């Protein structure tokens, strides 16, 4: 039998970077086309976020340079605020680091892995460092960054400083990657940037393809989106660990002040109510009869906390004990006490979390984006009111629907999360499932797969429930699924009205032509019978037909508007 010391001889602590180096597929680096798109996605996402947070209309330039077989250089440049020199290694070389991952705020990236994952992918496929050129308005810093995977740290292997007489601000990164391919498929870089332009009409995006062709997606809006607002966590959406860790970091001097100050929808009155619920739960757990215990839990869930308390002798003593808990320093809160607080939250009723921090694209901008890129004959957009899922996480759904014009036949679903295109893993995504659940024939789209229809769905949240770390598919959460369906049906009804009018107009044009076809013969016959000039009779009937059909069109439009 092997000794324990021998079994643990190869024991090694693995860093976050080392883990993701060995499991790059978890970050979306699977397949040659997808891997290249993922690299571009991470860089472009960083650029857009940086520009918007600084209140700058984004200008993003992407260049794909072919260096050899399945060997490319990816260059992404923006006009953002730039990166301070001391943060370069953190931004590009440290996993799970960033300005957004630790905040309860809507953002394109949520995990702090993105661009550093792209740097690592370039490093493990080409062996080359990533070249970063950036300036915040002062000197231009040029640095070559690599990741020390054992330490999960970035390191600058070479750095140069250049004068900046024109005051340039922005960031340019160059990543050399191998084992990837550039193709113009619906999972490639071109399609990704096209979809990004639709959801970000305020951004000017350029792409230089490997053959040197320049493609421009011009901005169609001059308005920078308002930055999202950080939101306090809602009691219904937190875990014991959240409360415990937050308590250790807070500057509040009592648990009561901590709960009121760090969470949404908690007031002094709510803390007093929380005290009763914690006391009631402590007392219920002392009840030995399980049937009675279950009844008490049910009554507590129904809000009968005072009646539950009064059913126990000496309950006031327990209430006083819990009240003391609320006056202790938060850093002294034990795990068990944090657990009691979270358990009580589950039985209490709270107002829905505030949703002012969510920033939708907006109906007008969705329509601008779809019109500017797709050139349809009909377009509409729906932004649903904010809702919550899992009891306390705010989210919002918006939908854009485009039809006809320059759109080719065949249904296209454009999926987004916080404005970011989702190109992969569509089958399991809630957006796909919701879109496929619609009976499109009810809305005069008889053959969806052949119809020139583009449906855009954007899910907005401080915590988008992705199905994996690759962030390409949204989990099928009931509340989100239902909101998507409602938004699609609203947009589809508008399309139905348009198509009904279009079909009616085509029918009327056909009828009008039929009547006009017989006018010459009728005019000739009536001219013989009445002695009136044939041309006058003919013009009379043509005017009559024109006026009659014009009146019919006005009446039909009034009916449609009032429907």
UniProtKB/Swiss-Prot annotation:
The reaction(s) this protein catalyses: ATP-dependent breakage, passage and rejoining of double-stranded DNA
Keywords on record: ATP-binding, DNA-binding, Isomerase, Nucleotide-binding, Topoisomerase
Gene Ontology molecular function terms on file: ATP binding; DNA binding; DNA topoisomerase type II (double strand cut, ATP-hydrolyzing) activity
Keyword set includes Isomerase: yes
UniProt-annotated binding residues for ATP: 46, 78, 99-100, 109-116, 471
InterPro entries the record matches: HATPase_C_sf, Ribosomal_Su5_D2-typ_SF, Ribsml_uS5_D2-typ_fold_subgr, TopoVI_B, TopoVI_B_transducer
PANTHER family registered for this protein in UniProt: DNA TOPOISOMERASE 6 SUBUNIT B
Protein name (database record): Type 2 DNA topoisomerase 6 subunit B
Annotated source species: Thermococcus onnurineus (strain NA1)
